Amino acid sequence: MSEFELTVGTIKDLDLLVEHRLLMWKDIYPELKASIEESRQITRSWIESKILEGSLVPFIVKTIDELIAGSGCILVKEDQPRPGSDQIRFPYLLSMYTVPEYRRKGVASIIVTAAIRWSRQNNFDRISLHASKEGFPLYEKFGFVQTNEMRLKLDP
């Protein structure tokens, strides 16, 4: 028996999902802590709207004692048609966060496994994500490969 249990989150988990998303950003960009905190309300509104419209599927991992160990979400996004696939919607894995005391104990793997299973059950042909430096080895273990996305930051 595993020491963890996976559940699919609901709107009732909104506070947790917001907190975990902000903690994820603070882990990745500690120097931006103040501006990350300033984004709390817009993050809350965004997560709430995506759950209510059905495009955000949260996965929450708890210990057998009901303590929160981590969370992550699938966001179903729309893309342009592309050769080799007739799908214009695809799952995007985001907001992966594991509570520090449960890191390296398989929590993130439980979430990734659930996201892959959910995506297959819903007949998607791919999953995309952006990996942090720390998360890269985990995703490679599951067969994710790096793509050629580039980004240009525009000044306002």
Question: Language-model segments: what does each one mean?
Answer:
Residues 5-19:
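A short beta-loop-alpha structural element at the N-terminal edge
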Residues 60, 67-76, 92, 97:
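Conserved beta-strand in the GNAT
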Residues 76-82, 128-134, 140, 145-156:
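Conserved catalytic-core motifs of GNAT/GCN5-like acyltransferases
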Residues 102, 106-114:
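Conserved acetyl-CoA pyrophosphate-binding loop and the N-cap/start of the following alpha-helix
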Residues 84-100, 152:
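Conserved acetyl-CoA binding element of GNAT-fold acetyltransferases
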Residues 112, 119-131:
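Conserved GNAT acetyl-CoA-binding A-motif
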Residues 45-60:
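A short helix-loop-beta-strand connector motif used in the catalytic cores of GNAT acetyltransferases and
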Residues 25-46:
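Conserved GNAT-fold acetyl-CoA-binding loop/helix
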